[in-house]
Curated annotation (Swiss-Prot):
The lineage of its organism: Archaea, Methanobacteriati, Methanobacteriota, Thermococci, Thermococcales. It comes from Pyrococcus furiosus (strain ATCC 43587 / DSM 3638 / JCM 8422 / Vc1). This is 5-oxoprolinase subunit A. GO terms for biological process: carbohydrate metabolic process. Its EC number is 3.5.2.9. InterPro entries: Glyco_hydro/deAcase_b/a-brl, LamB/YcsF/PxpA-like. It is an enzyme of class 3 (hydrolase).
Amino acid sequence: MKVDLNSDLGESFGRYKLGLDDEVMKYITSANVACGWHAGDPLVMRKTVRLAKKNNVQVGAHPGYPDLMGFGRRYMKLTPEEARNYILYQIGALYAFVKAEGLELQHVKPHGALYNAMVKEEDLARAVIEGILDFDKRLIVVTLAGSRVVEIAREMGARVAQEGFADRAYNPDGTLVPRSRPGAVIEDKEEIAERVISMVKDGGIRAINGEWIELEVDTICVHGDNPKAVEITAYIRRRLEEEGVKVLPMGDFIK
């Protein structure tokens, strides 16, 4: 049994520091690095890639809407052409630093509102995946487990990693409960670890209303932008390994 642990990193910008990247990087296997549009800048991007290299963590691009003020969490209506080229542009920007450090790019995980919009809008999902495949057909597309995006990406010939969220509540339809709703974000490390183990070993999780939903997950997102992030991430990894789960980069087992 195998699973990848990923985290959204490199989200500082200029003098503004966000996240505990140096510490979280010790416990994950894949890093989603912001590409400068919702967060990150050239200095932060290179620093984050170097940090991943130091910790033997695989690097992926984390492109989002062009929305620094809103941190990429506000919806924007894009044409398919805009979406395809926005993604290609951001992957290319990060890849410059990846190549400079002698690494390979493993995956692409869209950020925030873009990630969520792809689940609802098939045309947007196709355009984003086209942008990813334009760059490199070997890149893994990371998307919400059980969503229509998984089917679309596979139909288009992409490698896909289905993602579960360690600290987020789920709706009965398998989508994430909006952050604005009570109970959307889970903070207790024991509960978080049990939910992760349930997803990985039992193939599902309890929705916010108590319903059982089936989820096939390849990678678990752990957040690195809250005070307990390091403790929770380390605990999740330890618990998984105690359960006999191998924690590996997604590129090692996604076909």
